Amino acid sequence: MLTLNMNLNYQIDNYCLNISFLSLFISMICYWLVIAFPKKIFFLKFAHFEVSLANILLVYLLAYRWLKYSYFPLSNLYESLLFLSWSLTTIQLILEFKFKHKLIGAIASPISTLTLAFSSFFLPKYMQEVSPLIPALKSNWLLMHVSVILISYAMLLIGSLLSILFLLLSRNNKLNYTKNNNLTTASNSNDTLILKNEDKLNLLNTIDNLSYRIIGLGFPFLTIGIISGAVWANEAWGSYWSWDPKETWALITWIIFAIYLHTRINKSWQGKKSAIVAGFGFVVVWICYLGVNFLGKGLHSYGWFL
């Protein structure tokens, strides 16, 4: 009977994961179709439905593990990937509701889709199984520290991806735009480009502002996550900071986005220069979250691949 229940639970989890991935994949296609065909509002509504469905299923998967095993499911890489996928979809839905812009979904849906695909199809099965908590994780700080860090990663990833999109769309122009009658001029390295259609300028400004706002929201979460991690480390290991690879790269991530926010204050650095910093931050976040796990070194052993 116990084996039967375990198999049934595994099948339900597997179905939920597959449906979640399929929903996110469909939503990604729909968002891209909306970008290609702006008047087809049906695709946008269907994309919202699919993201919401995936979000609900991820809530079920996390809640089921929480209730069944009596601790919040953030004890290993697989569970953290599920939580990151949920964070990405939740933040996407909130931002879309607040800012009413389809670009957010077009940028966020590929990340959440790939994150969930990695957790479901690429991680070994033994890493997806539930195991007893190691002593260092038997703390109330588990929920506080890890959840806040992952939520910050979700915001920073979405915001920095928007900056990368900004760089791609503005790669032929500088952002020293001035208006002259009904035309918009942009300084180019060789000449002055006359933009008869102001839509591109408005789009660039929208992307730039969205990126700044989202990263501005994620940075305080990252700060709180690092501080709470230091307090927890002192309780668990007797030291606030040990220059563990994960700690070191978390600090590097914080510095990169602190530099980004500082560049936004300086007008000469706004636009492409600050977007380059944010784009670099996108890579650094993934190194901090996944890259250091390949090292197999440090105190954060529960996240290793090796």
Swiss-Prot record:
One of its GO terms (cellular component) is plasma membrane. It is found in: Plastid, Chloroplast thylakoid membrane. GO terms for molecular function: heme binding. This is Cytochrome c biogenesis protein CcsA. May interact with Ccs1. Its main location: plastid. The lineage of its organism: Eukaryota, Rhodophyta, Bangiophyceae, Galdieriales, Galdieriaceae. Although originally identified as Cyanidium caldarium, these sequences derive from Galdieria sulphuraria. Belongs to the CcmF/CycK/Ccl1/NrfE/CcsA family. It is a multi-pass membrane protein. Pfam families: Cytochrom_C_asm. Keywords: Chloroplast, Cytochrome c-type biogenesis, Membrane, Plastid, Thylakoid, Transmembrane, Transmembrane helix. One of its GO terms (biological process) is cytochrome complex assembly. It comes from Galdieria sulphuraria (Red alga). InterPro entries: Cyt_c_assembly, Cyt_c_biogenesis_CcsA, Cyt_c_biogenesis_CcsA/CcmC. PANTHER family: CYTOCHROME B_B6 PROTEIN-RELATED (PTHR30071:SF1), HEME EXPORTER PROTEIN C (PTHR30071).
